[in-house]
Amino acid sequence: KGATTETMKNYIMASTSQYGLFVNGISIDGNSDGSASSDALDGVNWGYAVNNTDPGVGMSSYSLKNNDAVTIYGLWGGGTWPNNVETNYSYFENDTVSTTVSGKATVTLKGLGYDKNFVASIVKPISKATVVAAKYENEASTATKDTAVATAQTDDNGVATLSFDKAGTYVLSAYRLDSDGKHSNISRPYGIVKVLAAVTTPTAAPTVTPTAAPTVTPTAAPT
């Protein structure tokens, strides 16, 4: 978005609480906010990551640095405490990839796992997640299973390969439902795929060797 300190308030809605600033919602168009759970599911809360890592402090305590990429995401808490379901902030290792109509787009989905102190510091592959790609129309475009034009499942290494039959720009995301079939146990990652038209090699015109004209030896006139 290229947001500045002055305009950030148009995109992040926050209020004060006894624990400091509390995020109420985020906005893409700068006009309306949204909850952490689009389906109003229980236990879905806001979190944030900086450069795809856990900053280790609350948002109001983090000091931004040049070129920091801040991601605010909604993530299911995994049920009542103690939490026996690990939920992961997830992201694409390369959030922008390119391919051609005749080629393949390969992405790697990673996530943050928790150490013994419940700090999200362990990078791990996210397997058995469904990667979805939808047509990119504008910066508000999202990819869901309903808008997807291409899907693929990640393997044990978090790798998924997609193919496209039309050139254009596509937005990527992924989801993975928990055993209850309702809650996604990863946050929704974001990426872009640029699909170029297939390059065709022109067929060379056949070369034709001209046929030499026959030579005629004149017959001498009789004397």
Please place each PLM-identified region on the residue numbering.
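Short, intrinsically disordered, charge-balanced linker/junction segments flanking boundaries
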Residues: 217-223
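Ubiquitin-like/PB1-type beta-grasp interaction modules and other compact soluble beta-rich domains
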Residues: 1-206, 210, 218
